[in-house]
Each structure stands twice: as structure tokens, then as C-alpha cells.
Design a protein with these regions (language model features):
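Expand to "…catalyze enediolate/carbanion chemistry for C-C bond making/breaking, isomerization
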Residues: 1-206
Length: 206
């Protein structure tokens, strides 16, 4: 990696693709994380998970009726997230090659977000708007994230039937606000209840 470091000039970013058999070895993954932090700490735009090539390492291809999380790669993705996201890297989820199956793509996108992935690689132009819309932030999450990040927020407070704790949820809130900045927020009609920390939202998609 040191040799590659000198090829990356100022104001340029790189996106590495994790797609070879070494990524099934968590020792290798830990070593790579350390090397990236040392050599490319500020230049890494994103780490892309190459799902199809990782499946190929196992002599597999994704079935047409399965999300990536229904395959062995579904066990690998949380491990990669657990190594890289706490270190400050963002991950891109694998492509969904069965581009005509929109409902299954949307299901996979929902699971991508649950697993902490910030974006998804598109394999076909018809997927771009679907991916972008899926990563828009729900208004409830957006406003709760704002409340959590408020410097005057209480240590624990309630909102929309949930308990929020800034000390615990701050990283989540920052992730939500980052997504909102990139993808936008689903339009909402706001109605504040008697307590300002309780927000009732009716969301509607554009």
C-alpha cells in the first residue's frame, strides 16, 4: 500500500473494492484496516463490497429470488462493517444484478441500511433512482437525529414512542444526518405535540 500511496495526489480520493478470497480471513481484514488507516486515512472515499466476486470465491452465484443477505455473503457483510465503520470508513453494498426484480432490490436496500451501509453500487441505470430514493432519510429519523445532536438535549428523552439517549445514539444521528445531506429527506408535514421533544410526522414520498 505504501507504493500506491504515492500515486494518489492531492485532492483525489480512492474507492477500494473488497472482492477476493482474503476478505473471508478476519486477520487479513484487520491488517488491511490498520494499513489503510496508516496510508490512506483521508483519501478513502468508500470501501466497496464486491458481492458477486466474493460469491465466486465460494463457487456460487446469487439466486434470482434471493437478496445478498440470503447467501453466505450475508454473514460476511456485518463482519466487514464491524471492522471498518468504527474505524471511520464508509462501505458500499454489493450490486444487485437481477435488475428487473425491483421489489427484491428494494428489500435488499432496506437490509443494506439496517446493516449500516451508506450507499449501494448500481449495475444498471434503471436502479439509480431506486437506490437514491431508498437512501433518503425518513423525516422522523431526521428530526430525531437533529434533537440528539442538539447541544441542549437532555441525557434521555422520548420521541414518537421511543427513548432517545444522545450519549448512545449520537453516532447513529450523525450517520442519519450524513445520509440526509447526500440523498435528501422524505417530505413531511410536522405537527408538534405539547412537548417539543415529541414530534408527530405524516410522511409522504415525492
Amino acid at each position: 500500500l505504501e507504493a500506491w500511496r504515492y500515486c494518489v495526489t492531492a485532492h483525489r480520493h480512492v474507492m477500494l473494492t473488497m472482492e477476493s478470497h482474503e476478505y473471508f480471513d478476519m486477520g487479513y481484514v484487520a491488517d488491511l484496516k490498520s494499513a489503510l488507516l496508516t496510508n490512506f486515512n483521508k483519501e478513502i472515499l468508500c470501501l466497496r463490497i464486491g458481492g458477486n466476486d466474493l460469491l465466486s470465491c465460494l463457487n456460487l452465484r446469487r439466486p434470482k429470488d434471493c437478496t445478498i443477505y440470503d447467501t453466505p455473503i450475508g454473514l460476511l457483510i456485518p463482519q466487514l462493517v464491524g471492522h471498518f465503520v468504527p474505524a471511520g470508513f464508509q462501505l458500499s453494498s454489493p450490486v444487485f444484478e437481477h435488475y428487473s426484480n425491483t421489489p427484491l432490490l428494494k428489500k435488499e436496500l432496506a437490509l443494506d441500511k439496517v446493516n449500516g451501509l451508506l450507499t449501494k453500487t448500481a449495475i444498471h441505470p434503471s436502479q439509480l433512482n431506486i437506490i437514491h430514493d431508498a437512501y433518503k432519510v425518513n423525516s422522523i429519523d431526521y428530526y430525531e437525529a437533529q434533537m440528539i445532536m442538539d447541544a441542549n438535549a437532555k441525557s434521555v428523552f422520548k420521541s414518537n414512542g421511543s427513548m432517545l439517549e444522545p450519549a448512545t445514539h449520537r453516532n447513529w444521528a450523525q450517520h442519519i444526518l450524513t445520509r440526509a445531506q447526500i440523498y435528501g429527506v422524505i417530505e413531511s408535514h410536522l405537527q408538534f405535540a405539547e412537548h417539543p421533544s415529541k414530534i408527530v410526522l405524516c410522511t409522504r414520498q415525492k
